[in-house]
Amino acid sequence: MQSIKEKLNPDHLPKHVAIIMDGNGRWAKSRGKERTFGHKHAIQAVRNAVNACNEINIPYLTLYTFSSENWNRPQDEVSTLMSLISETLLLEAEDIFSKGLRMHIIGDIKKLPPLVQEQLMQLVEITKNNDRGNLVLALSYGSQKEILNAVKQISAEVKSGQLNEEDITEEVFEKHLYTKDLPPVDLLVRTSGEVRISNFLLWQIAYAELQFLDILWPDFGKEDFFRCIYDYQNKERRFGKTSEQLDEQI
């Protein structure tokens, strides 16, 4: 019997997968532990997603690591998360490099602790020439603020005469987003059973397929990732067209 991975069509893979990694707290609570216990065990799920992407050659993976709203969580949890991010970057840096992955960071990283900022920039720098895949971490990220910042930048350029109002297009707007160097998202996955977007990549998921999984993030494995890709491949992406129009293009 074929595995899910073997059933995948290598000619119909998403170029960009984004994941809202949700459910760490509930996973820990179900085991009688503190929320931070779930965050620590979630690292293996991150490895699983990265390795799965690497195995089937999906070029872009974006992980919603820490949202701008997460700063409102209890201070001890935020501190633990920052320490965990720092430790994980140190532990995983060599593996990320050896896989040929290029690291990207999106979000308001100036709010992160100086040590974490430094580690992130070092990882971005040492992987900048890697070309076997792209790992994008969304840190201190909020899509509404990203869009608002883009509007402000464009407004300032119009006011200063650098840009004419009639020249503002979707492409121009996208060049002012954190994700200006990334392709649109093809598949958005959220774990934990919650059905919402949570201020994540609102512009970039305009035509993405959305999948909401009941599994909690620490339990997420490579087979779960491959199942998401399999389900994606069995959906018809129309981009506003009819099925008949798509058939005519084949």
Question: Across the structure, where does each feature detected by a protein language model lie?
Answer:
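Flexible, compositionally biased loop and terminal segments
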Residues: M1-I250
